[in-house]
């Protein structure tokens, strides 16, 4: 049985997947896990760019979701992405962070998309 934290994470990941699909991306894989790290979402843009997405979901306005993605987390993401890419053909890659803050009162949400976090978010 899933914990409340896992359920909240799944809601956020579904919202983010929908966000990418609406922008014309294809979903490649979800929840790829390795002993040293995980990839929440892997998508591909129409130009062939493979994007590795970290999704952070929070309720309310407490500690910032984006700030919770540390250098250590990005290192684990890169390592997982390198493993996932082995034996695959790809053009360009990018790392994005997408935060979802859900209002516990209304159920509404705010989604912030930070593209290319290794190069400085755009």
Curated annotation (Swiss-Prot):
CDD domains: PoNe_Nuclease. Pfam families: UPF0102. InterPro entries: Restrct_endonuc-II-like, tRNA_endonuc-like_dom_sf, UPF0102_YraN-like. One of its GO terms (molecular function) is nucleic acid binding. It comes from the Bacteria. Belongs to the UPF0102 family. HAMAP family: UPF0102 (MF_00048). PANTHER family: UPF0102 PROTEIN YRAN. This is UPF0102 protein CE1920. It comes from Corynebacterium efficiens (strain DSM 44549 / YS-314 / AJ 12310 / JCM 11189 / NBRC 100395).
